[in-house]
């Protein structure tokens, strides 16, 4: 139940911030119709990749034994699902956080980054533990 609430909260946060930014008529928004780093792929391919990645992350998450190693996988699911839903519902992913020199990004991108860092960190700790 906690996992569903975790993902649901961050999906809500992603879309709440997006709605607020649109309402604020922010000038720093970018409607990204391509993929990461501007890679142009058809939307059906994004959908297939997203579903495949979601299944992979779900399987990995089910293998985890504690919240410490579980949350990074949930962050990846929430971030990926947020961007996937946004692309399917609106035709593009709105990026609205601009921190130079980084590319413009959004809440889902933060979740994806934090999830990857968390997974790498937990793998490092497991390797260190097993010697």
What do the predicted segments below correspond to?
Residues 1-131:
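Alpha-helical transmembrane bundles and membrane-interface segments of multipass inner-membrane proteins
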